[in-house]
């Protein structure tokens, strides 16, 4: 107590300090009417409305409006969890999360929304979702927000202001924190680590999405069929299977796709890009996942076994398709003629018999094909490649079926 009195050298300091004990809060925010016992707390609070963020994280560049917010944020890097539950041992980095967790043991829910079960301190902000209160409106387009900071960020869409530029690739950003996050791509810095498996990420958002793999959380649900996803972008892409929307079009052949990644992979057909090479046999692939699957041919590994007939497969997708032989399930039906297939890829190829589409063109002679595998066989006419050799007489063939037919000469 003596130490406290010694530190309060001025009468004004003592009077202000006494307000902590009396509960008096004479300092009111003119934006939201929240009151404070100390003037410096009001000054810090006002930064939430002005959007001022003066405290920067040295790890990832995120800026916070208050020192206390920065201190809490730093725990996401250090992994420090100072608040431990004496009931179950679970630890937390933030006090409010710890206090909220304890209510699971006591059953206490003192601040509950009448619409859904959400507790303080988020209830006031959350209730605006029900009341529709959005006092901060954009003068350009009229869009309204429930916080001034959200409006400030939104307004940059109209001004196009991006003052923070990457000196590696020239990409510009509206906020410094976005630039610092982006620069992790160039530096390879991954400050956000998963506590479950140790995988590290350059951005916190990516870590949050990744952690859902461990928790099983899938917050984005399709209203059409009920299927749920761990990230919003996956839901948006999935919904196109219901709407039929294909916004990404190939400039070479006009083929449209529902996802940008599908278009990127398709475009490699035209440029002939195959960056992934098998170090065993030299076969090259357009996608890394195809190379990984191909490796099982050399290792002989087949971890997925059919519980009906015992047949084993190197890929789980192959097992799923195989099981349909036993069940007779053919979930992919042609809307034109009604023919059904057990694989979506088979339906895609079949549809080309109706549309006449031949997206795979030969770079040598221009002949086009409906399937990539047919193009690959055709290319051997130009290259002279004959990978199938008869062990009896040494004669070689470009196609496996020709090789098998030839071998019958020796067996008869």
Swiss-Prot record:
Where does the record place it?
Nucleus
The answer to whether UniProt assigns keyword Nucleus to this entry is: yes
* Stored InterPro entries: Krueppel_C2H2_ZnFinger (IPR050826), Znf_C2H2_sf (IPR036236), Znf_C2H2_type (IPR013087)
Q: Where are the zinc fingers (C2H2-type)?
A: 27-49, 55-77, 83-105, 136-158, 164-186, 192-214, 220-242, 248-270, 276-298, 304-326, 332-354, 360-382, 388-412
Q: Which UniProt keywords apply?
A: Activator, Developmental protein, DNA-binding, Metal-binding, Nucleus, Repeat, Transcription, Transcription regulation, Zinc, Zinc-finger
Gene3D superfamilies, per the entry:
Classic Zinc Finger
Any one cellular-component term (Gene Ontology): cytosol
Signal peptide positions (record): none
| SMART domains, alphabetized | ZnF_C2H2
Cytoplasm as a keyword? no
> What induces the gene encoding this protein?
Up-regulated by activation of alpha1-adrenergic receptors.
Superkingdom in the source lineage: Eukaryota
Chief subcellular location equals: nucleus
Q: Name one GO molecular function term.
A: RNA polymerase II cis-regulatory region sequence-specific DNA binding
One family from Pfam that matches here is zf-C2H2
> A Gene Ontology biological process annotation?
regulation of transcription by RNA polymerase II
- Quaternary arrangement and interactors, per the entry? Binds DNA. Interacts with GATA4.
Query: What's the stated role of this polypeptide?
Result: Transcription factor that acts as a cardiac regulator and an effector of alpha1-adrenergic signaling. Binds to PE response elements (PERE) present in the promoter of genes such as ANF/NPPA and acts as a direct transcriptional activator of NPPA. Also acts as a cofactor with GATA4, a key cardiac regulator.
Which family, according to the similarity comment? Belongs to the krueppel C2H2-type zinc-finger protein family.
The protein's name in its UniProt record: Zinc finger protein 260
UniProt source species:
Homo sapiens
Report the gene name.
ZNF260
